[in-house]
Amino acid sequence: DKRVKIFHVDGRYFVKRAGKVDKYDLIFVNIPDPSTAFLNRFYTLEFFQEANDILEKEGVLATGVSSAVNYLGKEVGNYVGSIYQTMHSVFPHVIVSPGQTNYFFASNSFDTATFDIQALTKRYVERGVQSEYFSEHVFHTLLPPGRVKFIGDEIKSRKGLSVNTDTKPVTYFFNLMLWDKLTGSQLGRVLKLFERSHLKIILIPIFVFLVCRIVYIIVFRRSL
């Protein structure tokens, strides 16, 4: 399809530059969960602001992360909740789909992104979409109203979560906590110390250790 253009460039870099020439109806961030600092860059306040700058007035930003179907414990709730809080600090309208993967749809318009099955079915039929893998009836399976309400209420109830930023990657931190819980590791105890401590308090002993290490190496080499 000649209408499709592929740009081999870092996503953040592309979004920063795209606003100067183009506006988009939809931005779909199709990347893995923020399990690394690199991936976390696409779930931060700064990225959502940059994406918002290149969206049309009724445009939609969509992304998704792994979640849980029937129960959001502390780790999962904080994880997906931090993304919701961060997106909602940029976009007035954010909705989240239920399921093993939570899909987030954010917009400046309250009319574009919706989970209303009748509205979605009407749009699907009007556009004449033809697919052997999807039909308008699938909306009932993907978006049962009870499940939609459940995930929305659960995420909105996570008050006081910090916004995820480039310099304070809390969503990355919550992802680590979630994986620690899933694997039964004891790393979570150490991570919680980082959560309660100020960054400077953590960096000072690391800096002192590095200085001592450098001094030791210099002195040791001179003694040879």
Language-model segments: which ranges?
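The AdoMet/dcAdoMet-binding core of the Class I SAM-like
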Residues: 1-84
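Soluble small-group transferase modules, centered on the S-adenosyl donor enzyme superfamily
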Residues: 2, 10-17, 21, 89-224
